[in-house]
Amino acid sequence: GNYYGYCRVHLNTAY
């Protein structure tokens, strides 16, 4: 995911 804690595929996954 991103540094914000949101992945591109799953907007609710961990880093």
UniProtKB/Swiss-Prot annotation:
GO terms for cellular component: extracellular region. Its cofactor is Zn(2+). Its EC number is 3.4.24.-. It is an enzyme of class 3 (hydrolase). The keyword Metal-binding applies. It is found in: Secreted. Inhibited by the serine protease inhibitor AEBSF. Keywords: Hemostasis impairing toxin, Hydrolase, Metal-binding, Metalloprotease, Platelet aggregation activating toxin, Protease, Secreted, Toxin, Zinc. Binds 1 zinc ion per subunit. One of its GO terms (biological process) is platelet activation. GO terms for molecular function: metal ion binding; metallopeptidase activity; platelet activating factor receptor binding; toxin activity. Expressed by the venom gland. Disulfide bonds: none annotated. Stimulates platelet aggregation through activation of PAR-1 (F2R). Belongs to the venom metalloproteinase (M12B) family. This is Zinc metalloproteinase-disintegrin-like proatherocytin. It comes from Proatheris superciliaris (Lowland swamp viper).
